[in-house]
Amino acid sequence: MNPTTNRIGIVAIVDDDADIREALASLLMASSFTIDTFSSAEAFLQFPQRKEVRCLILDVHLPGMNGVELQKRLLDAGEKVPIVFISANGNSSVRDLAMKAGAAAFLHKPVRAKTLLQEIEAALKSSRVQS
């Protein structure tokens, strides 16, 4: 994938649905974000530039390690990247678990473009304030 103008670092998208990854990538590139996409949590963990990721768009249900498990793994490693979860499942216990662990937002699929962009901007602002 060809990165566009780098406004803030990398926004990573982790979703096992290729159509969703492509749609989210197109939306974010049109908004001048540099993006990288991954089909699994394990693929994201192998990403050499993982420390450059400034926001993570993360599906809850993934093959292998799920999104909440990835969130825990990152936190345990001291990586405090803002996470915007997206899920087709409205399970409030999963939402509560993710939010208690520090997720920036928890959105339900289908995600409205404007809402997602607002949540990403808010997460990025919040992480800059905490830095």
Named regions from a protein language model:
Residues 21, 63, 91:
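The feature encodes the CheY-like receiver
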Residues 37-55:
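Acidic, metal-coordinating helix/loop segments flanking the phosphotransfer/catalytic sites
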Residues 69, 90-105:
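Alpha4 helix (beta4-alpha4-beta5 surface) of REC/receiver domains from two-component response regulators
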Residues 59, 87:
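Active-site residues of response regulator receiver
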Residues 109:
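A Lys-centered signature of the CheY-like receiver
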Residues 1-12, 18-25, 40, 114-131:
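Non-catalytic signal-transmission and effector/linker regions of two-component phosphorelay proteins
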Residues 68-79:
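Short amphipathic alpha-helix used as the core "switch/output" element in two-component signaling
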